[in-house]
């Protein structure tokens, strides 16, 4: 049923190795920082892997414009950063699960 002699033990060992790799990858992801931009780079927002905002950079030329436009640019830059961190997380986790034979559409618990 489990591939013969030692099959279940081997399966458990692989599961433990996978869990260790996933934990390490999650720790690495938490340390990641990405920067999202809007307004052709005039507004930049940097967030970490936990989606916490680390830094906001605003080009001085925007401080003379209206407040509403600046708020929109900051929101757009944050959304861009969030999209980028999600993509990076998916890529890193895909590398961890690459050796697993998962059914199509299976979602990992992270």
Swiss-Prot record:
Location comes to:
Cytoplasm, Nucleoid
Q: Does the keyword Secreted apply?
A: no
Kindly indicate whether the keyword GTP-binding belongs to this entry: no
Annotated GO CC locations: bacterial nucleoid; cytosol
Family named by the database record: Belongs to the YbaB/EbfC family.
The protein's job, in short, is:
Binds to DNA and alters its conformation. May be involved in regulation of gene expression, nucleoid organization and DNA protection.
Query: Would you tell me the protein name for this molecule?
Result: Nucleoid-associated protein KPK_4227
Query: What organism is this sequence from?
Result: Klebsiella pneumoniae (strain 342)
């Amino acid at each position: 049923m489990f591939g013969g002699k030692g099959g279940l033990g081997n399966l458990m060992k692989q599961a433990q190795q996978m869990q260790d790799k996933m934990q390490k990858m999650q720790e690495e992801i938490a340390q990641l920082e990405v920067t999202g931009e809007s307004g052709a780079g005039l507004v930049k927002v940097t967030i970490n892997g936990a989606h916490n905002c680390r830094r906001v950079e605003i080009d001085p030329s925007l401080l003379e414009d209206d407040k509403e436009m600046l708020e929109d640019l900051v929101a757009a830059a944050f959304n861009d950063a969030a999209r980028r961190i999600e993509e990076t997380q998916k890529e890193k986790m895909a590398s961890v699960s690459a050796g697993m034979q998962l059914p199509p559409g299976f979602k990992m618990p992270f």
